[in-house]
Swiss-Prot record:
Residues in the signal sequence: none
Segments annotated as Sequence repeats: 10-86, 101-177
Alphabetic keyword roster: DNA-binding, Repeat, Transcription, Transcription regulation
HAMAP family, per the entry: TATA_bind_prot_arch (MF_00408)
Family: Belongs to the TBP family.
Annotated function: General factor that plays a role in the activation of archaeal genes transcribed by RNA polymerase. Binds specifically to the TATA box promoter element which lies close to the position of transcription initiation.
Gene Ontology BP terms: DNA-templated transcription initiation
Organism: Methanocaldococcus jannaschii (strain ATCC 43067 / DSM 2661 / JAL-1 / JCM 10045 / NBRC 100440)
Record gene name: tbp
This protein's name: TATA-box-binding protein
Any one GO MF annotation of this record: general transcription initiation factor activity
One protein family per Pfam: TBP
Superkingdom field: Archaea
Length: 183
């Protein structure tokens, strides 16, 4: 059985950073366009950008989470945009904060239809209950990620910290499927 090398597509990158201390979210809400701040519903300010298409959650502590980016670089662009707007408005912020990837989500198509029942029976670290969820859940230890494998051959990998991790995880999945389907 020949399996082609599937293309990995990064569909979401979540990063975090710290842009300052004790941020006045009411003031920030008036400065930033597309900012929503409803403290009775959520303790952070939500700012949605269209380019790049991301959502930023800004907290009073100065912590910022950026979600929806397709790469770390895209998230960095979004955070730099916000920092520039706040700095231009006279808010004291850290200009070049350290940006850390918290989670990446990738998808791929294996190009085959794996037998999920066989994989669930023969591979440790898997859960498959088709009455509850159509995908097989496969928890890898290295890289430490969760992989959802569907009968169509589509996979979703969560908990990634890098694209390299995505490649390593996909190789392990393919090797495992080859092994199971050869038995």
């Amino acid at each position: 059985m020949k399996i082609m090398e599937p293309e990995i597509k990064i569909v979401n990158v979540v990063v975090s950073t710290k842009i300052g201390d004790n941020i006045d979210l009411e003031e920030v809400a008036m400065i930033l366009e597309n900012a929503e701040y409803e403290p009775e519903q959520f303790p952070g300010l939500v700012c949605r950008l269209s380019v790049p298409k991301v959502a930023l959650l800004i907290f009073r502590s100065g912590k910022v989470n950026c979600t929806g980016a397709k790469s770390k670089e895209e998230a960095e662009i979004a955070i730099k945009k916000i920092i520039k707007e706040l700095k231009d408005a006279g808010i004291d912020v850290i200009e070049n904060p350290e940006i850390k990837i918290q989670n990446m989500v990738a998808t791929a198509d294996l190009g085959i239809e794996p037998n999920l029942d066989d994989i669930a029976l023969m591979v440790e670290g898997t859960e498959y209950e088709p009455e509850q969820f159509p995908g097989l859940v496969y928890r890898l230890d290295d890289p430490k990620v969760v992989v959802l494998i569907f009968g169509s051959g589509k996979v979703v990998i969560t908990g990634l910290k890098s694209e390299e991790d995505a490649k390593r995880a996909l190789k392990k999945i393919l090797d495992t499927i080859k092994e199971v389907q050869e038995l």
